[in-house]
Amino acid sequence: NNMSVLIVGGDHLGSIPKELKKIGADDIRHVSGRNRNVIKRGMPMAMDLIIVLHDFINHNLANVTKKQAKECNIPIIFAKRSWSSIYKKLPHHLTNN
């Protein structure tokens, strides 16, 4: 059950990566969203899920990420930087295993 997750926003992820590993994520990447070049070059898009920490990124980046995710058919969730906020929004097939 290989799963890759891209987290956009926030500098310190705290327990989030550890919790994601528990539900099967083994490839976790993080872009803080401060560096515009990353966004211009494009996100690493071969991901199974994108988590946007919306309290840490600007509106423009949120929209760009959303658009790219939609084009690539990748599920995207917008959450605060807390595991409970993320967990509540995860696709059901991830939380029911």
Placement of each model-derived feature along the sequence:
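Redox- and metal-dependent alpha/beta enzyme cores, enriched for Fe-S-associated oxidoreductases
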Residues: 1-24, 39
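A short, well-structured beta->alpha microelement
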Residues: 26-43
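Short glycine-rich, flexible loops that bind phosphorylated cofactors or substrates
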Residues: 58-60
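A short acidic, amphipathic alpha-helical/loop segment
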Residues: 18-19, 40-43, 63-65
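Cofactor-binding loop segments of dinucleotide-utilizing enzymes, especially the Rossmann-like FAD-
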Residues: 8-10, 33, 81
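Ser/Thr/Gly-rich flexible loops in soluble cytosolic domains mediating phosphotransfer, phosphorylation
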Residues: 69-97
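Alpha-helix C-terminal capping/helix-to-coil transition sites in glycosyltransferase folds
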Residues: 45-47
